[in-house]
Design a protein with these regions (language model features):
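Bacterial N-terminal signal peptides that target proteins for export
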Residues: 2-15
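Aromatic (Trp/Tyr) and acidic
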Residues: 29-114, 118, 147-173, 212-218, ...
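Asp-box/WD-like beta-propeller blade repeats and closely related beta-sheet repeat scaffolds
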Residues: 143-156, 179-223
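Solvent-exposed beta-hairpin/edge-strand motifs
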Residues: 495-507, 746-748
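Beta-strand-rich ligand-recognition modules
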Residues: 510-530, 536-548, 695-725, 731-805
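Bacterial N-terminal signal peptides
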Residues: 13-24
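Helix-terminus loop motifs that line ligand-binding clefts
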Residues: 72, 100, 114-150, 184, ...
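C-terminal beta-rich recognition modules with glycine/proline-rich loops and embedded aromatic residues
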Residues: 248, 317, 379-388, 393-481, ...
Length: 806
């Protein structure tokens, strides 16, 4: 029986809630639901305490400002939606109570925050009270639920997190009511989705947006419903009740058939074998190869493999992972381009990349595979995301998370809002403590290096305390104090990151030989109180050369950290550049380590930098993890303007890409004094009379551009001068999802002045059109219209100017 520690700091009210809900019991492992057990078992959040360092501070902010303080997030509103059940529209907001509850359970356990614990208990009580007698626990209007329509389109995705949270409440607190609520919710799916009932094909009545009635968006085919196999199999693992296993097997057996309902050529499930064979990429298995959705389905397949021993499932998932890791992982460890996996090597820097939802499930998928296989490659990936992209997506005051976090982008003051990624960000951060340590029959694993204390038991029942003291990854040294209750022989396995070529490890000052990077160092010995392990991971900064769309660019790395040029550390800022490629770095000069103020991931690396045509000057490059911070210190916080540029991939001094970007910037200096009018994502769109054809007006859409399909159009009005030559400039960013379908005419007051074709996502395209004199004669404004070519799309416009002169 594996038990979890209970938080000792509880109020009297919290204790009464424990008694009311039967929370005093400790969850027991179900009868063995594993034919294929994991190689290691992660240590629960309740046994990991005293987090320190940068991760510890971000964890504290997430706990206090976000989960407890509700900074920038209307948590109560979403909980009331579950209680009131009035939602009719297709949307994805019903996941927030489940995401919040699970995050609050983990965080309250790790931090001992009694107020958060009480709030989590109350949330659990309200969610259980809101459950319908038939088991439904979502936000769909009760009047709309029928046997033919038991689910709203996003219910499976939203209730994925609800079911996980209920199971976590049972496993962490021993809550029998939570387990019963979990079973009722799972039984609702068993009773309503199945042979002769509804299935996970999303019938979409509104074909203009593809919103499904049963299982999410039609573009996901069935996978936005089948993802429910993950919490369903977790419930089977917790209870051993066969109906959850059998339902999951039925779902997996129908993935191919449901996928074909959208496209008869698809073999969504079987083609994963082609991915494993190297004959296909995960991005080519289906259209809209949504990363986050794949991850959740893969987790369910792995649980099903463990329960049944069906090795074909493991082969499919591991094959997909090999494909993803070979070409679709950013230097920061994150994944997803426009939320999806692509068919090629495309990893754009400045587009909509590294969705926070995808980062969350990517972390979980790597952790699950690490536990199953003990392959440290998965721990290495977690390390990259944990120290780079996840904190970069987090506002440094704890006030929110970005939807996407570009590797070359613009800083903003607020990351608030109520998107799916907001909930995923605080859930992923809260879950980090589960990734640090693990156990097996022989002993213990140290998987991640974060200042922390863990108290656990060996398979023999002997208690052991491990305490990590480290400034990693700022510093090179990790000290691990090992304190068993009594002297005992066991294995302590310490991960040696693959990036470190020459690690140094000692036990009580004595060096250990034959250390292999990218493996675990197994220290099998008799351990006693006072034993100390020290690991030193030498970090030499180096420039990583880019490939494919990053060819000709470089990225500065030190240890697991990716660095960036950050406008807040540049005198005068970087607010007016069109491209970060106009910022050139001297890769021949050795970077110099410099300290950063408290609150930053550090250290800085001082590097000579040339901005446009200015003389080179030394600039502090800082870790990418700081991308969510727009100021240097509190005194600077309010006066510092946002929208500073930053970039992790940079052009070297003297490179072709830098020379081209500098030429554009110099030309722009001449252009700017002659600009008559301009619109774009940073401007008041309404002042320019936005119009479009068949589709509803949307202004600058959520990604900063309009997209109009075959034959459709959109337009703006721009000012001109009546009797002078006028040039129209149209700035576009690369096409969406790797599909080169953006092709459209440019018309001014109905007359075609040119056309544009926008390539795949990386890069910028400028259209420059000299307007005929008769078009502007006697006018003070014109209408600029973009008309999609047949079978193509019009869009990706982010900058539109009228300029005096030719």
């Amino acid at each position: 029986m594996r038990k979890t520690n209970r938080i000792s700091r509880m109020t009297g009210r919290a204790l009464s809630v424990f008694c009311l809900f039967g929370l005093g019991a400790v969850a027991e492992n179900a009868p063995s639901a594993f034919l294929m057990p994991s190689r290691m078992t992660s240590v629960p959040a309740g046994q990991v305490h005293e987090l320190g360092g940068f991760i510890g501070e971000r964890y504290r902010l997430n706990t206090e400002a976000r989960l407890l303080g509700d900074l920038g997030f209307e948590y109560e509103k979403f909980l009331r939606m579950v209680e009131e059940k009035k939602t009719a529209q297709w949307c994805f907001v019903g996941e927030h109570p489940g995401k919040w509850l699970e995050a609050a359970i983990w965080s309250s356990q790790a931090t001992g925050n009694a107020a958060l614990r009480a709030k989590a208990e109350e949330t659990l009580r309200r969610m259980i009270a809101a459950q319908e007698p038939d088991g439904y626990l979502g936000i769909m209007a009760t009047s709309l639920r029928t046997p033919a329509q038991p689910l709203r389109g996003m219910d499976p995705y939203e209730q994925y997190f609800t079911l996980h949270a209920l199971i976590t409440a049972y496993e962490a607190w021993g809550s029998k009511p939570a387990l019963e609520a979990a079973k009722k919710l799972a039984d609702y799916y068993v009773n309503t989705v199945g042979p002769g009932k509804v299935e996970f094909w999303p019938k979409h009545e509104d074909r203009s947006n593809g919103c499904g009635t049963i299982a999410g968006h039609a573009a996901h085919q069935c996978l936005e419903g089948t993802l429910f196999i993950d919490p369903m199999m977790r419930l089977y693992q917790a209870t051993g009740e066969k109906r959850y296993l059998e339902w999951t097997q039925w779902v997996v057996a129908n993935i191919n058939r449901w996928g074909k309902m959208n496209d008869p050529k698809l073999n969504v499930f079987d083609d994963l074998d082609l991915v494993a064979d190297g004959k296909k990429t995960i991005g080519a298995v289906k259209g809209w190869s949504h990363s986050h959705t794949w991850h959740m389905n893969f987790l369910g397949m792995l649980r099903l493999y463990q329960a049944t021993g069906d090795a074909t499932l493991l082969r499919k998932v591991e094959g997909a992972m090999r494909d993803i890791m070979s070409r679709q992982v950013f230097a920061t460890g994150a994944v997803s381009v426009h939320e999806c996996y692509q068919t090629d090597q495309l990893l754009p820097n400045g587009s909509a990349v590294a969705e926070t939802c995808a980062s969350m499930s990517w972390l979980e998928l790597n952790q699950y595979l690490l536990e199953m296989t003990a392959n440290p490659v998965y721990a290495d990936t977690i390390e990259k995301v944990m120290f780079n992209h996840l904190p970069a997506a987090q506002a440094s005051d704890g006030g929110g998370f970005g939807y996407h976090t570009a590797l070359v982008g613009t800083k903003v003051r607020q990351m608030g809002g109520q998107t799916c990624c907001q909930g995923s960000g605080h859930r992923a951060t809260a879950e980090l403590v589960r990734f640090f340590y693990a156990t097996d029959k022989e002993g213990l694993y140290v998987n991640q290096f974060v200042p922390s204390t863990v108290r656990l038991k060996l398979a023999t029942g002997t208690g052991v305390t491990l305490k990590q003291a480290t400034g990693y990854p700022n510093d090179e040294t990790i000290r691990i104090d090992v304190t068993p209750e009594k002297a005992e022989r066991f294995a302590l396995r310490v991960r040696l990151p693959s990036w470190c070529e020459k690690p140094v490890l000692t036990v009580n000052g004595k060096p250990v030989s034959d250390l292999k990077p990218g493996s675990y160092c197994a220290l099998k010995r008799e351990w006693k109180a006072g034993d100390v392990v020290e690991l030193r991971l030498p970090m030499t900064p180096y420039w990583l050369k880019g490939e494919y769309n990053n060819s000709g660019l470089v990225c500065l790395k030190r240890g697991p950290l990716v660095y960036m040029v950050d406008g807040i550390w540049v005198e005068g800022g970087l607010r007016d550049l069109r491209s970060m490629e106009a910022v050139a770095v001297d890769i021949c000069a050795a970077p110099v380590v410099e300290a950063l103020p408290a609150g930053f991931m550090g250290p800085a690396l001082a590097v000579p930098v040339r901005i446009v045509d200015q003389p080179a000057k030394v600039v502090k490059m800082v870790p990418f993890a700081n991308a969510g911070r727009w100021y240097i210190d509190e005194a600077d916080k309010e006066k510092r303007p946002d929208r500073n540029l930053y970039g992790a991939w940079l052009a070297p001094v003297g490179s072709e890409r830098n020379a081209a970007a500098v030429s554009l910037e110099v030309a722009r200096r001449v252009e700017l004094p002659n600009v008559i009018d301009r619109t774009g994502p940073s401007f008041k769109d309404e002042a320019h009379n936005p119009q479009n054809g068949k589709e509803k007006p949307s202004g600058w859409s959520h990604l900063g551009y309009r997209t109009r399909h075959s034959g459709d159009w959109f337009s703006w009005d721009l000012k001109v001068l009546p009797d002078v030559p006028i040039t129209l400039r149209v700035g576009c960013s690369g096409g969406e999802f790797g599909i080169k379908k953006f092709s459209f005419d440019v018309l001014v007051d109905g007359q075609k002045v040119g056309e544009m074709k926008v390539p795949a996502p990386e890069g910028r395209v400028d259209g420059v059109f000299a307007l005929p004199a008769e078009l502007t004669k006697g006018k003070d404004k014109v209408t600029v219209r973009f008309q999609a070519h047949p079978g193509k799309q019009a869009g990706r416009v982010f900058d539109l100017l009228t300029i005096k002169g030719k």
